[in-house]
C-alpha cells in the first residue's frame, strides 16, 4: 500500500490562518488546504496560489490549495481552526462568545463529516470556551481536541526574559497556566535560563514587570498595529503544535486541555502543561503549586467558567 502524504487543513484564511498555512508548508509537514467561506473563495485561492508559487524558491515540496469547499479537506490528519470574528466596539463578551460558538459548531460538523479521524487545534477566541464547544460538538475523544494559548503566552514570556538577560531565547524555559491574557498564571518557579532559575537572575520587581507585559502582550501588539492583532507568533505557535502531533515529538508544552480532575477541575478546558505527540494530548502534567499559585489559578478558572456561562444552550 502506498504511503499517504500528510494533510493539514486550516479553517479561516485571515492573517493568522494564511500565515499558519505558509509556516506549515515551509516545514514540509504535509500538504495544506486553506479554507474560508464562499464569499472569500477568491482571496483564499489567491493567497494559496501565491504561497504555492513561493515553494520552488524555498525548496519546499508541499502543495497549498485554497478553497471554500470542505470536501477538499477530506481525510485531513490535522485541522486547525482560526475562523471566527474579533470583538468589535460595542459588542458584549456574551455576543462574541455566542457568535463564535455558532461558527465553531458549523465548522466542527464539516470536520467530523470529512475528517472523522483528525486532530483538531482551536485558536479562535475565547479559546478555552471555543475548544470546549468543538469538543462537545465533535464527539471526539478529549486527546484529539486541543486549544492554543499557552504556547503563545510562553513564547512571549521567553522573548521578554531573553531580552532582559541578553541571552538566546533557546535557553529560556517557562510555563504559563490558566486562561489566555490577563488571568494567565506564569509559573516563575518553573522558569529558567540555561537551567538557572529566573529568581537567581532577575530581581522580583522586574520579573513582575515582565509577567505583566506578557499578560498584556496581545494588547500591546494591537495598540502598535492600530488595526488588527498579532498573527506571526500565533501562527508559529500553531505550527509547533501541528509538528508535535505529526512527528510524534512528545513535546512538553502548555496547551488548552480537557480536565477530568487534574488541578481539581472537572469538565473544563484550561491551559496546562501537556505532553503533545502522535496521539494528541497524551498526558496532562500536574505541577505542585504554592498557595499563591493555586489562588491565581482559581481566579483564572473562574474567569474561564464565567465565559463558559455565556455559551448558548445546546
From Swiss-Prot:
Annotated keywords: NAD, Oxidoreductase, Phosphoprotein, Tricarboxylic acid cycle
Residues modified as Phosphoserine: 149
Binding-site positions, substrate: 87, 93, 125, 156
Enzyme Commission number(s) of this protein: 1.1.1.37
Protein's name according to its UniProt entry: Malate dehydrogenase
Catalytic reactions of this protein: (S)-malate + NAD(+) = oxaloacetate + NADH + H(+)
Keyword NAD applies: yes
Listed Pfam families: Ldh_1_C (PF02866), Ldh_1_N (PF00056)
N-terminal signal peptide: none
GO biological process terms held by the UniProt record: lactate metabolic process; tricarboxylic acid cycle
Family from the record: Belongs to the LDH/MDH superfamily. MDH type 3 family.
Binding-site residues for NAD(+), renumbered to this chain: 12-17, 36, 100, 123-125
InterPro entries registered for this protein in UniProt: L-lactate/malate_DH, Lactate/malate_DH_C, Lactate/malate_DH_N, Lactate_DH/Glyco_Ohase_4_C, Malate_DH_type3, NAD(P)-bd_dom_sf
GO MF: L-lactate dehydrogenase activity; L-malate dehydrogenase (NAD+) activity
Entry annotation: catalytic residues: 180 (proton acceptor)
Reported function: Catalyzes the reversible oxidation of malate to oxaloacetate.
Organism: Shouchella clausii (strain KSM-K16)
